[in-house]
Amino acid sequence: MPDICDSNKLNHRFRGYYPVVIDVETAGFNANTDALLEIAVTLLKMNDDGILVLDKTVHFHIEPFEGANLEPEALAFNGIDPTNPLRGAVSEKEAFLEIFKTVKKGQKASDCHRSIIVAHNAAFDLSFVNKAIERNDLKRSPFHPFASFDTATLAGLSIGHTVLAKACKMAGIDFDNKEAHSALYDTERTAELFCHIVNRWKALGGWPLATPEQSAIENTDEKIES
């Protein structure tokens, strides 16, 4: 169990996992058939006081993979035109190789042994990330293939709401609905929400965990008071 000093280090906070916040924008809900169109990745770090904060963000517009399905309803919802040359889109492979490089660098600097995806309704984002990695036969992914931190679940527990915009506002985080459904904007708001939840839990005394000796003393005090 980490001591009070170690608990302020990122590599001791999440069992050696390096949290990486991700948001994707897609051309549908099916990771097997629908195009991945945009991805943003926000790295996190802990300051000297053990407060989790945003570090840096990388962002890519993605070219639809060959034969990808483009659902008109999805494109109308996120406002993305995959054919627009001004997007500056790159291939899935190019984007993920750069993401791997950036994440591994941050993971190493934090002395963590693996990265774990943080996302709002994380199963959706994780499915598209995993399928893109598989489709491009990319090796040595830094990400855990199935474990994740879902901020929808965490926000529902800690704040009382699962919708990103409403959870952010309830947490005191500015959220502009006009900017929503951009991977870049949503990723950074999700990162702020995750940091808020983690830091609030620490402020309430939930972290670091009490040692067995401390727990024994607290239990004894409770018995005396009762």
Curated annotation (Swiss-Prot):
EC top class named in words: hydrolase
Active site residues per record: H181 (proton donor/acceptor)
Family recorded in the similarity comment: Belongs to the RNase T family.
Site, as annotated: Important for substrate binding and specificity: F29, F77, F124, F146
Cofactor: Mg(2+)
Binding site for Mg(2+) 1: D23
GO biological process: DNA replication proofreading; tRNA processing
Quaternary context: Homodimer.
Identification of the protein by name: Ribonuclease T
GO MF terms, alphabetically ordered: 3'-5' exonuclease activity; magnesium ion binding; nucleic acid binding; RNA exonuclease activity, producing 5'-phosphomonoesters
